Amino acid sequence: MKPDILLEICCGSAEDAIEAARGGADRVELNNNLFQGGLTPSIGTLEVVKAEIDIPVMAMVRPRAGGFCYTETELATARADAKALIRKGADGLVFGFLHADGTVDTERTRAFVELAEGRPCVFHRALDVVPDWKRALDELISAGVTRVLTSGQQSNVFFALETIREMIAFAGNAIEILPGAGITLENVDRVVRETGCSQVHLARHRILTDTSVANNREIYYGGCLYPPEDRIEITDREYVSAVRSRLGGSER
């Protein structure tokens, strides 16, 4: 395994990001609500993370769950969030904008690249639903996007290794390809070997218990799935460290 494979960890809280950095992550993607694919983190979360870790923090800008064709109100929210995140020290932005037909909204994409003020910009897995990924990559390159996060238009990277390899070859040095979704300690070697990627994106959590809700097990604060309210997910530092070792490098 090459020692220069960059490890990015997908994080849903300040605790996640701190544990990821301690485990040896090279970069974190900071979100809120990973259950819904990751939404915009709070400014307070970003401030705490920036005060505690010294690796790049890419901040998600996603005002709601679901698709990526936003109303003007949602776009205004995303714009305000992006400006605040940059002002508070985000090292880059992660976003995705599509038209109703699933093609890249280049105008909105370019506008958010400008909001980043020269910092790296990532077009996230919205790429995985575009009808023509080659055309989409060309448009993202033209818009000034630094990197794309992709599962190769499959539910799991492992089912799209050849496509991701094709994406990397097509992109050349014009835009970075970051594989993510379904990468594990057990398959990361093969993902790197068969795609030729130089970086990987993954998440892994362990479960903590919050006993403050133990007095009444009939109460739920979320929607219809009714998850146990005493369970908290946090980045598994030891797992991150194991992946870092597998890729080459050591725990921080």
Which sequence ranges carry the predicted segments?
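Active-site-adjacent beta->alpha loops and helix N-cap segments on the catalytic face
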Residues: E15, L34-I55, T73-L75, F97-E117, ...
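N-terminal pre-domain/capping segments
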Residues: K2-V28, N33-T40
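C-terminal alpha-helical cap/extension of soluble enzyme domains
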Residues: A65, G172-R252
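Catalytic cores of alpha/beta
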Residues: G12-R22, C69-D81, D128-A143, M167, ...
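Structural motif corresponding to the early beta-alpha repeats
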Residues: E47-I86, G96
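Glycine-enriched alpha-helix->loop->beta-strand junction motifs that scaffold or abut catalytic
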Residues: R22-V28, I53-P56, G89-G92, L115-R119, ...
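Hydrophobic faces of well-ordered beta-strands that scaffold small-molecule active sites
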Residues: I5-C11, V28-L30, V57-V61, L93-F95, ...
